[in-house]
Design a protein with these regions (language model features):
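Glycine-rich beta-strand-turn "strand-cap" elements at beta-sheet edges
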Residues: 1-9, 49-55, 84-103
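N-terminal first-folded block
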Residues: 3-39
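Short, well-ordered beta-strand segments in beta-rich or mixed alpha/beta enzyme
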Residues: 11-18, 48-75
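Extended aliphatic helical segments
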Residues: 12-13, 24-28, 44, 64, ...
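Short, glycine- and small/hydrophobic-rich beta-strand elements in well-ordered beta-sheets
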Residues: 36-59, 100
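An amphipathic, aromatic/His-enriched active-site/gating alpha helix that lines ligand/cofactor pockets
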Residues: 39-45, 64-98
Length: 103
């Protein structure tokens, strides 16, 4: 991953997740296994996942990809398909995702 001064171009994706209350610990475990793999993808400039201190079922993702193609590639990786699409998403009560560009 590049430092923050080197990432001011590309596609920024933010996501907010809310896990089902009984699934929080499982979601944390899945994300801990997923994150290092996502951070090593060639098109990823930054990838951070945060958990709320006051509402532990809520998660915030900050992702910077080289471009839209890198984001599309990310969603086709085995770790995304298995850990996120296959395991994490069914454990969520809510998911929002937005794409941004640097100004």
């Amino acid at each position: 991953m590049a430092d923050l001064h080197a990432i001011h171009d590309g596609l920024v994706v933010t996501a907010f997740w809310e896990a089902k209350p009984a699934e929080v610990d499982q979601v944390v475990d899945i994300l801990k296994r997923f994150l290092p793999q996502a951070q090593r993808e060639p098109g990823v400039k930054a990838f951070q996942i945060h958990q709320s201190l006051t509402e532990p079922e809520k998660f915030f993702f900050y992702e910077v990809f080289r471009d839209e193609a890198a984001f599309a590639d990310h969603q086709q990786t085995d770790h995304f398909k298995t850990l996120i699409a296959g395991q994490a998403l069914p454990k969520l009560a809510k998911r929002e995702r937005t794409q941004h560009r640097f100004v």
